[in-house]
Amino acid sequence: GIMSIVKDVAKNAAKEAAKGALSTLSCKLAKTC
């Protein structure tokens, strides 16, 4: 139902946020920002 849709959206948002944070962190470490 609605709850599983909300859960999926939240999971995807968390995944995207983690990806963004990871790429920001790695570019800072590599000084390529």
Swiss-Prot record:
Protein name: Gaegurin-2
Binding partners and assembly: Monomer.
Subcellular location: Secreted
InterPro entries the record matches: Antimicrobial_frog_2
Gene this protein is translated from: GGN2
Role summary: Has a non-hemolytic activity. Has a broad spectrum of activity against both Gram-positive and Gram-negative bacteria, fungi and protozoa.
Cystines in this chain: C27-C33
UniProt note on tissues of expression: Expressed by the skin glands.
Database matches in Pfam families: Antimicrobial_2
Main subcellular location of this protein, as a coarse class: secreted
GO cellular component terms given for this protein: extracellular region
Species annotation: Glandirana rugosa (Japanese wrinkled frog)
Keyword hit for Ubl conjugation: no
A Gene Ontology biological process term: defense response to bacterium
UniProt keyword annotations, A-Z: Amphibian defense peptide, Antibiotic, Antimicrobial, Disulfide bond, Secreted
Family: Belongs to the frog skin active peptide (FSAP) family. Brevinin subfamily.
